[in-house]
UniProtKB/Swiss-Prot annotation:
Family: Belongs to the universal ribosomal protein uS2 family.
SUPFAM superfamilies listed in its UniProt record: Ribosomal protein S2
Region (Disordered): 225-254
Top-level division of the source organism's lineage: Bacteria
Gene name of the record: rpsB
GO molecular function: structural constituent of ribosome
Keyword Thylakoid attached: no
Keywords assigned by UniProt, alphabetized: Ribonucleoprotein, Ribosomal protein
Name of the protein in its database record: Small ribosomal subunit protein uS2
Example of a GO biological process term: translation
Length: 254
């Protein structure tokens, strides 16, 4: 288990810097510490509490074997969110949100199967027999699908939760999740409505350092849950093997 995130870590990463006071959403009032130089400052003690609550809930989801979809299409979040999702072998959408990715998942699955078929076809000898134009068309189509859907290529069923950076930018993804009853975990800045998500984490959603530290904190929680799940499965397998051996030994004695 990695070092637990502390108040100073959040402070050093600028997690407390909100938006200009004139851009605030009054529903964020419970999470705001003060106003300074026309900017709202977020109460980092509240951020820590919310982060703990989010990780505890995510832990339960991940230990059940379900997936968490990472969603972050804003430029400064794409790299770190993609890297963390890949590290955890979790699905992600960081290029753009394809409308219906959740609410029309059956159609999305068809596109994923098409992408998989194209990949197999391009490795086949038959691909080289196509003329140059046909190969180019096929390659471009696959590339286009991969750009949008590559991050969810291994998603065989709807995710059990989504983790979002910037609720204003990802409002379509959040609306789709809410419609399907999928819990939403999100970094929420002072210009946003925290009530539209299930687990808001009040924080600066614009600065790279802030996005990084919180995404990695969420990622660490998920990693811990995955390790616990593996341990539980290994223990169950060991117990099963022991019971089987006992039964076998008993049968031999008889």
């Amino acid at each position: 288990m990695a070092k637990k995130i502390e108040y100073k870590d959040l402070l050093d990463a600028g997690v407390h810097f909100g938006h200009l006071t004139r851009k605030w959403n009054p529903k964020m009032a419970p999470y705001i510490f003060m106003e300074k130089n026309g900017i709202h400052l977020i109460d980092l003690n509240k951020t820590l509490v919310c982060l703990d609550e989010a990780n505890a809930a995510l832990k339960t989801i991940v230990r059940s074997g379900r997936k968490v979809l990472f969603v972050a299409t804003k430029k400064q979040a794409q790299e770190v969110v993609t890297a963390e999702a890949k590290r955890l072998k979790m699905p992600y959408a960081t290029e753009r949100w394809l409308g219906g990715m959740l609410t029309n998942f059956a159609t999305v699955r068809k596109s994923l199967k098409k992408m998989s078929s194209m990949e197999k076809m391009m490795k086949d000898e038959a691909f080289s027999s196509l003329n140059k134009k046909e190969r180019l068309v096929l390659s471009r189509e696959k590339e286009k699908l991969e750009k949008v859907l590559g991050g969810i290529a291994d998603l065989t069923r709807l995710p059990a939760a989504i983790f979002v950076v910037d609720v204003k930018k990802e409002h379509i993804a959040i609306a789709e999740a809410k419609k399907l009853g999928i819990p939403v975990f999100a970094i929420v800045d002072t210009n946003s409505d925290p009530t539209i998500v299930d687990f808001p984490i009040p924080a600066n959603d614009d600065a790279f350092k802030s996005i990084s530290i919180l995404t990695q904190a969420i990622g660490q929680g998920i990693e811990d849950a995955l390790s616990e799940r593996k341990r539980e499965k290994d223990d169950a397998k060991l117990k099963e093997d022991e019971e089987s051996k006992k039964a076998s030994d008993k049968a031999e004695i008889q």
